[in-house]
Amino acid sequence: MKEYKNLQCDVLVLGGGIGGLTAATEIKEVNPDVDVLVLEKNFAGYAGKANRGGGVLQYFDLNRVDPELFVGFHTHEIGGLFTDQPLMKKYVSMSGEMLEKLDGWGVVMPRAEDGGYRIIPTGPFTAMICIDLDITLKVRRRAEKLGVRFMDKTVFSDLLTEGNTVTGAVAFSVLDGEYSVIAAKKVILATGSQNYRVGSMWSNGRGDGYIAAFRAGAELRNTEFGNFAQLVRIRSHNEVVFGENYMYNAKGEHITKNFCQHRETDISSKAIREWYIQNTTGNGPVHLDFGDEPQVNLELLWDRPYGKKFRVLNDETGATVDTDLEVCPMLIGEQSPMKVDREYRATLDGLYAIGDCSYCGSGLAGAVPAPPGRNRGSGILNAVFAGLVAARNAAACDYSGEFKPLCAKQIENAIARVEAPLAKENGIKPEAVIEVIQHAMAPVEQSVVMHADRIAKAMELVQKAKTMLPDMKAEDYHEAMECLEAEAIVTSAELHYLASDMRKESRGWFLREDYPNMDNNEWFKWIDAKYVDGKIELCTEELPTDDWFITKEELITGLVPVTEEEKQTELYKKYYLREMTKPNPMKFMHVGEPKDGTKAQHPYDLNKLFDEGYMDMEIGFAQLPDGGATLANITEMPGVTPEMFDFWFAWHGLEDLRYKVWDREDHYFARTRNRDKALDKSLSMKERYWDTIHDVDENCGLGKEHIQINFRNPADIGFDPEKLKDFKGTIVCSGNEHSPCIMCHFLRPVEGGCELRTRFWFGYSIIGGKPVKVLPDGVEFPLIPVQALLAHNIKEFANLAAILPSIYEEYHADFE
């Protein structure tokens, strides 16, 4: 057996990207007496993905964003109901602390004139901050000052264990082949995800770290959720972030409409499937058409000198070959399956796994691959978050005891495994094995848009690659490292397809064409993997939902919860259990894209609603010319009278169930703060809800959120009192000087009932009895929540139109 150096440290950090550097630095800040060693196959500070990507950090304004509301949004819109709610809440809650930590470590983040961060809104809850690509160098410098030790150009091949406890690792130098056996009391795995070496930006994600842990006995979880793909320009392979919103086929048809009802947070597997369908049905190629919409150039917003040369060179090179905007999907991968708890402890004692090693394995984000994971800017912050959490747990441990003895047989086997391809006189290059796996994984119809037949085809290639592994030959220790990576890439692909074949449903990003629906009865569970006697074994695990604030029952049924007391009522039996009336599906065509804002009604023109006929935009949503936003919906309400409508808004805020039966999938409660007024029979029905406030919990399309609705007399928000005197309908409206939203439900009689014309205006308040724009000049109100609210409004009022006449008949007499 080859000779080796014996080394010791309290904490061994495997991987010198942003996650590993964060963990090492934080441990030394919390407990300076802990001896920390970082081992990196490249150079720590230049390794990982944080210094070669877009350089963006996710940002949450915690003065505006309730972490639980974001968790609800993420659970439904991104995570396929599998989001670990308490862990995600912790991530969001720590966002400000993480930014301050990076700032304190010397990472330069752009500031606005007022001293706050310069941000770009990216969704209803999130924004992003751009940073320069020297982030990892800055953190390494801080770690060095604190006394963290580094071993660069050193590959770890195997973990050492005693029973179920990690005791250290075996490593070798890629420069001269010198072996090191490192005893450690704690080990933090921060070696990244598996990216199958398809896309150059992510090619350093080789999966060898977590596969080594897997072979040592660590369990994995959610290996099927590691198949992210991104649209790229077909010649340069440059990413086109958010390009899925602008997809057109060869016939000039806007095919985004085929899979997306409203603009989503990021690309989904449905976009990949649409590309595949268009090309297999003769409608390809697919190209992008941005129309007149300006494209954001982050380099124009912030000067990032360190990464600027790279970005300019990359863009200039791409421009020489990208003669048009034809796109195709490119597999990114991002398998990140180390099974960990909420302190990022793996199933082997003494082992932590952070960042892209354990993103899916932690359950944090649910059924979605590692960052970008349909959540732009979360990659770096996820690594920082996991690094901080694991580091604080590790720093609090007792390091006073002796090191555990290392197993000589394990050391011998580890060195022999590295040396085996070096000893061969003849053989194949590891690239030959990797290429076979790329043929199995890179075609998105096999790895992303999955079907049993295509999974079987891909598995044949995986098995072929598996048989090639013993024939690999290495000329030097660089190639010996590559042989380890080839073994890992084969195992990663096998894990992906075994678990994908096992999961008979579609969920979140995960898509099975032969099982297109989410199956919460059979598959509300994780798939775990164990390595037993040299073979992969899969089993299922129930999700631990006891401390989730959105309950499992609520997630599975898709209905808001009801109490046992509510279940005894006639209102529950007759209206909650009743299937909701579905709106005309043609109405949802108006939810896909914004309308022309110059033709939409402005809040300053409230009184035009009294005019006969219809306006240019009676249904749809739009950006108004001054930056505000609006939505309009029109609902036919046969058999409904203005008296019924007024009754409903005075009556439903008195009991939670009354709001639930309006929309049992999205309405949790509406509670009036003015019960005495609502019950005062000396007042007219309108007066019983005018100048009252309802506290509302509701899912308006982006997850559960809390809303305050201040109902007003229409004359107090700008409607003409003279016109109101002659109006035969009713107007239910809200708005005040505190809220940047004005709501108006304008109900007018028509033959056979009434017609409801709804308007919402965003970026405006009621000040001095009239609408006033409060949105800063030059700022546009984001359209994603407006778009989502339109879809919700269409849904809820279709059902109210169906149930209101009978509810009024049964309940109004006792209320009046």
Predicted regions and their residues:
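Core beta-strand elements of the Rossmann-like FAD/NAD(P) dinucleotide-binding domain
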Residues: 6-9, 176-186, 346-348
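Terminal "cap-and-tail" regions of soluble proteins that handle hydrophobic small molecules
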Residues: 560-626, 749-816
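Glycine-rich loop(s) and the adjacent beta-strand/alpha-helix scaffold that form part
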Residues: 186-238, 362-393
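Mobile, glycine/GP-rich and aromatic-enriched active-site lid/loop segments adjacent to catalytic centers
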Residues: 96, 103-157, 224-374, 442-561
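Long, amphipathic alpha-helical stalk/connector segments used for oligomerization, subunit docking
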Residues: 397-478
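Hydrophobic ligand-binding cavity/cleft-lining segments
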Residues: 589-680
